[in-house]
């Protein structure tokens, strides 16, 4: 029964994260946004380091963008529509440092999402992550840019 409650909590958190709109940011100018939620405390995960990489022609990962989540658990302004061209990208969320800052020893070093972007034309991507010390879930919301 406890596992069912945990599953429902995780699903509810994913719905919350994926449905919530950006806070005070013009979504039409944000082609890549990351949202991070702390499932243990039921709150935004603040000050979480996020690194974005782009796969190069030689199959290596080149640094593309980085930043930290805000008080709302969101990270905007990672790139522009002009820079965010078709390709394979990796979003790496530093979960270990986040949990260590709260005095918790986590299992994972980081959460990672690898995806193909803009292969069907320009799109806007919201990568959402729901974190706990021993697990994480991710989802993506992909939309057409607003004119």
Curated annotation (Swiss-Prot):
Q: Does the keyword Phosphoprotein apply?
A: yes
Modified positions (Sulfocysteine) in chain numbering? 30
Write out the function statement from the record.
Thyroid hormone-binding protein. Probably transports thyroxine from the bloodstream to the brain.
Residues carrying covalently attached carbohydrate according to the record:
118
Q: How does it assemble?
A: Homotetramer. Dimer of dimers. In the homotetramer, subunits assemble around a central channel that can accommodate two ligand molecules. Interacts with RBP4.
Subcellular location(s): the record lists: Secreted
Q: Which Pfam families match?
A: Transthyretin (PF00576)
Q: How is it modified after translation?
A: Sulfonation of the reactive cysteine Cys-30 enhances the stability of the native conformation of TTR, avoiding misassembly of the protein leading to amyloid formation.
Name the keywords, alphabetized. Answer: Glycoprotein, Hormone, Phosphoprotein, Secreted, Signal, Sulfation, Thyroid hormone, Transport
Any single biological process term in GO: purine nucleobase metabolic process
- Modified residue Phosphoserine is at which positions? 72
Signal peptide span per the entry? 1-20
- UniProt-recorded name of the protein: Transthyretin
Q: Which GO terms describe its molecular function?
A: hormone activity; thyroid hormone binding
Gene this chain is encoded by: TTR
Q: Which domain of life is it from?
A: Eukaryota
- Chief location category: secreted
- State the family named in the UniProt similarity comment for this chain: Belongs to the transthyretin family.
Detail which positions bind L-thyroxine.
35, 74, 137
Q: Which GO terms describe its cellular component?
A: extracellular space
């Amino acid at each position: 029964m406890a596992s069912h409650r945990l599953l429902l909590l995780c699903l509810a958190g994913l719905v919350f994260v994926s449905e919530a709109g950006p806070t005070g940011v013009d979504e039409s100018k944000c082609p890549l946004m990351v949202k991070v939620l702390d499932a243990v405390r039921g709150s935004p995960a603040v000050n979480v380091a996020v690194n974005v990489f782009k796969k190069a022609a030689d199959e290596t990962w080149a640094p593309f963008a980085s930043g930290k989540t805000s008080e709302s658990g969101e990270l905007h302004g990672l790139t522009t529509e002009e820079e965010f061209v078709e390709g394979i990208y990796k979003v790496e969320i530093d979960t270990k440092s986040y949990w260590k800052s709260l005095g918790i020893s986590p299992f994972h070093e980081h959460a990672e999402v690898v995806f193909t972007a803009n292969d069907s034309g320009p799109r806007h991507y919201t990568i959402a992550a729901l974190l706990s010390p021993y697990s994480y879930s991710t989802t993506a919301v992909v939309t057409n840019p607003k004119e």
